[in-house]
Design a protein with these regions (language model features):
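Glycine-rich phosphate/pyrophosphate-handling loop used in enzymes and phosphotransfer proteins
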Residues: 1-140
Length: 142
């Protein structure tokens, strides 16, 4: 049986304990079940240009660790796992045919140069392909 390392608890696990696996990393069922999930998607009440945002999970200590590893420790493979978690969440909503684009949060040019990638764009690309909605890099970080 193959093994993977859970990105949340950093433990080496047998593949039959996984909620998701991507190569040698994954998310064990125990960690996935203990993530603080949001109750529902709610409209963003900010501007006329952003009608809707959503997040499947609360930004807790464990989620923060994974996101920071993705952003600052060159753990780009984490983006696929986070996107797969987002896909599971999105399947419970039937609103995607009304969306024109998936737009990732822009990264400042300085950060992009330092990091070499935009973690939000990596996740958005996976989600856009899954939903068959074009991804658009139209926001500018100011």
């Amino acid at each position: 049986m193959s093994k993977y390392i859970c990105v949340f608890c950093d433990e080496r696990k047998e593949s039959d304990t996984a909620h998701l696996i991507n190569g040698k990393i994954g998310i064990c069922r125990h960690c996935f079940e203990n993530l603080d999930k949001t109750a529902y998607a709610s409209p963003y009440q900010g501007t006329e240009h952003i009608a809707f945002t959503m997040s499947p999970f609360e930004y807790t200590k464990s989620m923060r660790k994974v996101i920071l590893d993705l952003k600052f420790s060159n753990c780009k493979a984490y983006a696929k796992l986070l996107a797969d978690m987002m896909k599971d969440y999105l399947d419970s909503y039937d609103i995607w045919d009304t969306f024109d684009y998936i737009v990732p949060v822009p990264l400042h040019k300085k950060r992009l140069k330092e990091r070499g990638y935009n973690q939000s764009e990596l996740i958005a690309k996976e989600v856009a392909e899954y939903l068959k909605i074009p991804m658009r890099l139209s926001l500018i970080h100011i």
